Amino acid sequence: MDVKIELSSYVRVLKLASTPSWNEFSQIGLIAGAGIVFVGFLGFLIFAIMTLLPGGV
């Protein structure tokens, strides 16, 4: 395993990477938040259906 080659590839990737703008950052935050809310709502919906059905948990 050649550590020097691996480190140079990591450095190359870090040089290409850039800090996201505020618009990109807020858009990513909104999309991630919407996904979290959706998964939570889906879990609550499944829980509510299982509770209302006879023989549910």
Swiss-Prot record:
Protein name: Protein translocase subunit SecE
Topology in membrane: Single-pass membrane protein
Record keywords, A-Z: Cell membrane, Membrane, Protein transport, Translocation, Transmembrane, Transmembrane helix, Transport
UniProt subunit comment: Component of the Sec protein translocase complex. Heterotrimer consisting of SecY (alpha), SecG (beta) and SecE (gamma) subunits. The heterotrimers can form oligomers, although 1 heterotrimer is thought to be able to translocate proteins. Interacts with the ribosome. May interact with SecDF, and other proteins may be involved.
Example GO molecular function: protein transmembrane transporter activity
Segments passing through the bilayer: 30-50
Compartments, as annotated in UniProt: Cell membrane
InterPro entries linked: Prot_translocase_SecE_dom_sf, Translocase_Sec61-g, Translocase_SecE/Sec61-g
GO biological process, one term: protein targeting
Keyword Signal: no
Organism whose genome encodes this protein: Haloquadratum walsbyi (strain DSM 16790 / HBSQ001)
GO CC annotations, alphabetized: plasma membrane
NCBIfam families: PRK09400.1-6, secE_euk_arch
Keyword Zinc-finger among UniProt keywords: no
Principal localisation: membrane
Its biological purpose: Essential subunit of the Sec protein translocation channel SecYEG. Clamps together the 2 halves of SecY. May contact the channel plug during translocation.
Similarity comment: Belongs to the SecE/SEC61-gamma family.
